[in-house]
Amino acid sequence: HARDAFLLFETLNLKLNLFSSAMKLNTQYMHILHFHLKLKSPTTIQKIIAKLEKNDRIALTDKINANEVFSFGRDHGHFGRILNQAVVSVPSLSLINKNELTGFCFTPQDGNSILSSLAITEWFLYPHSYESKIQCLNPLFFDEV
């Protein structure tokens, strides 16, 4: 994962020091991501949450259990799917020295594969207007899980 992310950011001339690890479990729930980000300037948890709330591809949750998050998706999602790119667990967020953020997020594979495939297809076909064309998906994203 870190190698893929490194290569992606390298296309933007950014050389980031990234680390990842993986643990395989016998479960249908895929990808829970632990993150530790060093921020450029001091901030607060409230400001971080406000920025996350403004991103329509990110959902927030008070849940810390993968079963609850993905069960919500099965019960309320479009054909049982969460199409958001990430579901950030708010209780897991921790700010150290006002500029190091750690936490967990759930990354539903439906959101990653379906949304990314649609976006790249639209970008390929309509490079100057793909953003407006994929806005029809907005009603399928959750603000909160």
Regions found by a protein language model. Name each.
Residues 1-105:
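C-terminal substrate-binding/catalytic lobe of Rossmann-fold NAD(P)-dependent oxidoreductases
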Residues 81-145:
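NAD(P)-dependent Rossmann-like dehydrogenase/reductase catalytic/cofactor-binding core
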